[in-house]
Amino acid sequence: MAGGSQADSTVRDILATGGKVFMKAYWRFPLFILLSFSAACGGGSMSSSTPPPPVNAHVQIANTVTGPLNLAMSTSFQPAEWDYQFFTINSGATTTLGNLQPQHIRLQGISQGVPQGAAGSASTAWDFNILDAITQPVLSVGDHSPEFQIAKAPPFLYSGDNSGDDFVDTSFQPFATYAQNLVLYYNKGGFAANGQTYVSESPNPITWWGIYNEPNINNGLTPQQYVTMYNTLVPQMQTIDPSIKFAAMELAYFSGQPQAWLPAFVDVNTGVTARVDVMATHFYSTCNQMDDDAKVFAMIKNNFVPDIQYFYSEMATNPALAALPVWVTENNVNADFDAGNGMSACNPGQPFVLDQRGSDAFFAAWRPYVFSQFAQAGVQVLYHWDFDADAQFGEVDYNTDGLQLSYWVDYWLARMFPSASGANILQSSSDDPNIEILAALNPDGSVVIMLANHAVNAPNDNNGPGAPRNTAVDVSALGSFTSGSLLTIDTSTSVTSGPIATSVTPSASMTVSLNGYGVAFLTLK
């Protein structure tokens, strides 16, 4: 779900958020998906119950390594007519973005962010202005190596010149020609069309390319048609630039979707034959703001992790895919959005309610919990959806570049657990299942221990305060340390300046207190 990028193919969504207008492209929203969410949605309401006295918990960190920690953080943009002015109206936004240290920032151009054609028209004219208003600044930031997802084809390649309808030509040859021109534009000095030469301003090429967005819910595609699309586009793009790399699948998250789509793709006889560098998918904990906190947290272990494990088990059946990593290229708490007239896109007949859990103290427990579980499951990049948005989706505010608490959570995850550091995950245990632990041993002998408190205060809390925990952390097995620091992100953290680390004195057992939802990073040297 690209920021709530599903709606009936006859609906054009307009979501106005403080001056930013989201005009969603035409997307299919099959009935079975509606039913899946309906069956999963609960009836929690907004609540703010009073926390009880803290519960004492005990955590033990062993000196046993369980595997490498190689999970990078990243973020996303959706170049389109409702999004393209972000860098223009916020002159310092590239600095804010770069400070996150994102890896392979994701670009998902849709609607007028697709640089050829126009909705409802057979036009084949090119216009990169909206796409490049986001893409060019992103190419100047960080690793200068975004993942460009070819999310949609030009409108004239679909029935009725409508990008929400079926492809006219399911050989996908015309789509491949369009994709070749994108590679020419960004990597090989441009191309000529309609008496004009089109060439990217940036000296930085685009190495990473994603082949389509959420094929399991868009344009009536079948699993085998996606295989055909992938096998057609990738080799033809490689004829333009043999050095480029590819992300496959990028499925919308619903129960049973990996099981429905992966077998056809990985099949050694009838599946993918083109180059694949990563497999990718998307995860949201809910599509209904009424789902209570406990249900939203439970999705992580009960649904996200088993699906990642299924990805790896299916990939293992194909020698060409067996050693590849999985990237989670979209992730956030709630995928719902305003489908027009203030109504929910995911829950017909129900008013849309902005879910603040995407940017408050709930997120400070939820995202670290996700990060820890994905790190241990072998995910290699975790993408936030999306960078510039509102309080439900954004790390910063679209109109002001103002920071949200979600920004600081992702900022510190990237710094505490840098993916290229060579760190290893240490075995840990706890007597409290509501404390998520991730302990990392760095090559220099220092240790970072993350404790995320996702204890729910009351069973029906919806964006509640969480329940306080005093956690005794036993590090006696790790030897002695000479210095330490503690950094906490919770409801008391300044959104403007972020959390401030305090010095602590190392000892065999150290107590970390969290007064509700939040995360603490204990660093020992």
List where the protein language model places each region:
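Substrate-binding cleft and catalytic face of glycoside hydrolase catalytic domains
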Residues: G98-F297
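Bacterial Sec-dependent N-terminal signal peptides
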Residues: F29-A57
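Solvent-exposed beta-hairpin/edge-strand motifs
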Residues: V475-S494
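C-terminal beta-strand-rich structural cap/linker in extracellular carbohydrate-active enzymes
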Residues: S503-K525
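Carbohydrate-binding surface patches
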Residues: S430-S480, Y517-T523
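Boundary/entry segment of secreted carbohydrate-active catalytic domains
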Residues: P53-T96, Q103, Q108
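Glycoside hydrolase catalytic-domain groove-lining segments
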Residues: C287-G342
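Aromatic/acidic polysaccharide-binding cleft in carbohydrate-active enzymes
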Residues: N332-E436, P443
